């Protein structure tokens, strides 16, 4: 089972970007989640939200 959250290292590797840029993306995505009323963890991003926002992939129920 995959962890629910991605760390900056995993985001950087997935997108082939630098670690500081990965942190910038995570901050931006976490701000979006905070705006929707979610609690966020600094330096980590929900895997499902990451995939939805970056790839447009939504999990069908």
Across the structure, where does each feature detected by a protein language model lie?
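Polyanion-binding surface elements
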Residues: 2-21
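Residue-level preference for well-ordered alpha-helical positions
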Residues: 12, 51-52
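Major-groove DNA-recognition helix of helix-turn-helix-type DNA-binding domains
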Residues: 17-51, 57-60
């Amino acid at each position: 089972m995959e962890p629910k959250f991605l760390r900056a290292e995993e985001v950087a590797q997935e997108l082939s970007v630098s670690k500081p840029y990965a942190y910038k993306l995570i901050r931006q995505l976490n701000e979006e989640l905070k705006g929707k009323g979610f609690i966020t963890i600094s330096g980590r991003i929900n895997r499902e939200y990451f995939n939805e926002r970056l790839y447009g992939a939504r999990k069908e129920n």
